[in-house]
Amino acid sequence: MSRFFRGGDDSSSESSSDEEELYSTSEEEEEEDQDQEESSEEEDEEESSDEDEGPKKTGLSRFLVDQASSDSEGSDEEGATKVKSAKDKRFDELEATITTIQNRQKIDDWGSIANEFDKLNRQVVKLQDGGKAPKSYIKCIAELEDFLNETLAKQKVTPKNKKLNATNARGLNAVKQRIKKNNKDYQAQIDAFRKDSDDFMESDEEEVPAPKTKVRFQEAAAPEEAAEDEDKGFARVDKRGKAIPFSPESIQKHLRAIVESRGRKNTDRGEQIKIMEELNKVAETPYLKIRVLQTLVSARFDLGSGTTTSMPLDHWKAAERELAALLTLLETHKDHVVIEGAEEWEDDDKTPILGPDDKYIKVPGSVVSYIERLDDELTRSLQSIDPHTSEYIERLTDEASLYNIILQGLLYYETIRKDASLEIPQESLNRIIQRRLDHVYFKPAQVVKILEENAWKQVSSGVDSAITPRGASGDAGKLMYTLCNYLFDNSEGIIRARAMLSQIYFLALHDEYYKARDMMLTSHLQESIANFDVATQILYNRTLVQVGLCAFRRGLVYDAQNTLQDICGSGRQKELLAQGVMMQRYNQVTPEQERLEKQRQLPFHMHINLELLECVYLTCSMLLEIPLLAQIGSSPDIKKRVISKTYRRMLEYHERQIFTGPPENTRDHVMQASKALAAGEWKKATHFIHSIKIWDLMPSSEEIKAMLAKQIQEEGLRTYLFTYAPFYDTLAIETLSTMFELDSVKVSAVVSKMISHEELAAALDQVTKTVIFRKGVELSRLQSLALALSDKASALIETNERTLEVRTQGSANAFSRKDGRQGGQRGGGQRSGRGGARAGGNAQRQAGGTQFTGGALGAAVRG
C-alpha cells in the first residue's frame, strides 16, 4: 500500500488489539518500504542540492565524478540527518511501552498494565533474535513479576474497604495468569538478571544480526549435514522459526496452549493435531497419555464442527482408534479415572501423583460425550454420501467399530459406578445404553447376533457386564428386553420414552404384533408425544408405521389400515419419517428450517421403504372401502362414513378418466384391482395385486401374496352380496363357494358374520344350506334415487330458512312508519308471489320460522 494512503490510516487513533495482531506483519513490511523510500528520497535531495551548488555540467561530463565532487559529497553526507531503521523504531516503541508500564506501577493501575503487557508481548516477537529477547524486556517482566507478588501479598492483609476496585482487580488477575505462563519461556534469562542485574545489563551487548553471506554459507553447508539430520530427526518449528521442544516435561504446557487457542480465528487445527500426535509419542506416564488423547480427540472433532461439513474420514478413523486406546488405557490403569466435575490440574511443571489418602487420579472429561460425538459424526457422514454407491457401503462398515467403542464405554462406566465415592451420575450410563439401543433396535435378530459376537471378541475375557452378560449376547430379543427394562427402571423423560419405542419397534419388526400393540397402548405415548423433542417424535412415527406393517403381515387388514392412517393419510410420509424434505409451495419453509430438516434426516440404511408403505396402505384401504361403497349403494340409510379420504380421492380420479391404460406403478395396480373387485372379478383383482413387484421386498413374500388372495376372495364375496342382494330370494352356499373358490364353511362364516352385524338382511338356512333374503328391506335403484332427491330438497329448505332468519334477525319493525302504516303493501293486505301469503305488520311470526314454506319447490315436495 502506498505511503500516501498510510497517512490516513495513521491518523486514526483507535484500533483494537486484535487488529494490531492481525496486521502486524503487513504494517512491518510497509514501514520497511516507507523507510527505504524516505532514505532514497533523502539521497536524491542531497544529490540534487550538490548539483545545484556546483557548476552545471552538460553532455558526458555530467555523468563523470571527479575528485572535488566526491569530496563535497562526503562532507554533505556527514552533515545529513540520520534516519532510523525499522528495527530502531521498534526498539523505541518497546522502550516507550516499558516506560508506560513502570509509570502505571507507581499508581497501581492494573487495568492499564494488563493492556500494556499484552502490547509489550506483541512487540517483542518482532525483536527476538535467535530466540533471545531484548534485555530491557527481560528486566521489565522480571520487575513486573516481583511487583505482582508484592501486590498480591499486600492484598491478603488489606482491609476490604481498601482493596482494589473491580477494574484493577480484573487487570491484576489477568496479569497474574499471563505472566506466569509468559515468564516460563524466558526463565533462564530472568534467573540471570536476578542473580546480578548490573552484570546482566552491561555484559554481552546485543548481538549484531549475522550478515547474509553467513546465512548463504550455512544453507550451502546444509546438504553436508543431511546424514546427521536423518539420524537425529527433524525438529518441528513454529511460525517464527523457533524449534518446538517435544519432551514429557513440555506436554502440559503445549496442551494448555492448544486448549486456550481452540475456537479462535486463524487457528491452524491441522498443525495442532500434528503437534499432539508428536506429544502422544513422547508421553510416558498414564496421566499424560490420557490428557493427550483427550485433547487430540477433541481437536479432531473440531474439524467437523461446521453445520454443513462432516468430519473427514481419516480423522474419524483416527479418533476412533484414539478413543479405543483411551478406554484400553483406563481399563489397564484403574487408578486413573476420567469423570465429569473433576478439578483441573493447574501445575504444568509436574504431573499429579497419588497421595497416601488418595485412591484415584481424577482427570476431567466425559467419555460418553466423546462416544456420542463420534456416533453423530458417523451419522453426518452417512447423510452426505450417495446411498447408491459403494462408498456408502464401505462407510457403513465403520458402524461395527463404533459399536465396539460403545460396548467398551458401557463396561467402563459399569466399573467406575461400583465405587460410590466417585459419584458417577446415572444419566451417563443411561446415555451410553441409549446409544447402544439406537444401533440395535431397527436391525434383524441375525444381524444383532453377529454384531454382539464381534464386539465381545474385542473385550478382554476377564471383563463382563452386569447389565448385559457376555453369555446372553447371542439372543437379540433378550438383549433388547434387558437394555429397555434397565432404562425403564433407571431413567425418565425422553430416554425412557425412546427405550419403550425402541422395544416396540423391535417387537413389530419380528412379527410380535400383539406384544407391540399392547405396549403401545399401555405406554400412552400417543397422548404426550407432542411434548417431546423432534427426534423422539420421528421415532414414534417410525414405530407406528412398523406396527402397522406388522399387522398387515399377520393378515389384520383393519388394524393395519387404522394404524397407518395418521402417517399415510397426511401425504407427508417423507417428512414425518425423516426420510426426505417435502417440497413446500409458496416458500413456506425458510432456509434455516430446511437446513434443520436435513440435519434430522436418517441415514439411508435406516429408511422404511415408502413405496412399500404406500402399497400396503392402499391395499388395506381397498379391502375395506370397496365393500363399504357397495353397502352404501344398496342401503342409503347407512351413515355415509369414509375410511380413507386419500384412497377415495384416488379412486374418484381414476374413475373420471376416459381411457385407462395398463397399470404402470403401484398406485395404478391398486386402482385397477379396486375396479375389478367392485365388479365382482376377484381373480382379476388378485392378478393386479400380485403383479406389484414391491411385495418381493418383504420377508415371506409368497405367504403374503397367499394371504392377500384369501382376503380378496372374502371381500369379493361381501361386495357381491351387498351389490346383488336385492335381486335374490335365495342363494345357495355351494354356489357362492364355487364362485369365489372358498370352502363352504368359510362362506357360511362370512355370511353369518354379516347377518349378525346387521349388514345383510337375510337368514341362513342350515338344513338346505342357503341364504334367504328378506324383501322390502333393500331398496330398489329408483327408490334410492327418490330418497336422495328428497334429502337434497330438505337440505335446501333448511338452508334457505336459516339464511332468512339471519337476514331478518332483529328487524321485525324495520318497515313500520310513525303513522302505523306498513311499508311495501299498504294496509298490510295480502301479497301474492313466490313467498306465499304474508301477514300484516302487527301479526306475530310463527315459531321456528315455519312461516317460510319454501315456495313452489316446497309445495311440490309436500304434494
UniProtKB/Swiss-Prot annotation:
Keywords, sorted A to Z: Cytoplasm, Initiation factor, Protein biosynthesis
Top-rank taxon: Eukaryota
Residue stretches of biased makeup (Gly residues): 822-839
Keyword Protein biosynthesis applies: yes
Subcellular localization, as worded in the UniProt entry: Cytoplasm
GO BP annotations listed: formation of cytoplasmic translation initiation complex
Biased composition (Acidic residues): 16-53
Bias (Basic and acidic residues): 79-92
Subunit structure, interactors included: Component of the eukaryotic translation initiation factor 3 (eIF-3) complex.
Family (UniProt): Belongs to the eIF-3 subunit C family.
The protein, known as: Eukaryotic translation initiation factor 3 subunit C
Organism: Chaetomium globosum (strain ATCC 6205 / CBS 148.51 / DSM 1962 / NBRC 6347 / NRRL 1970)
Upper lineage: Eukaryota, Fungi, Dikarya, Ascomycota, Pezizomycotina
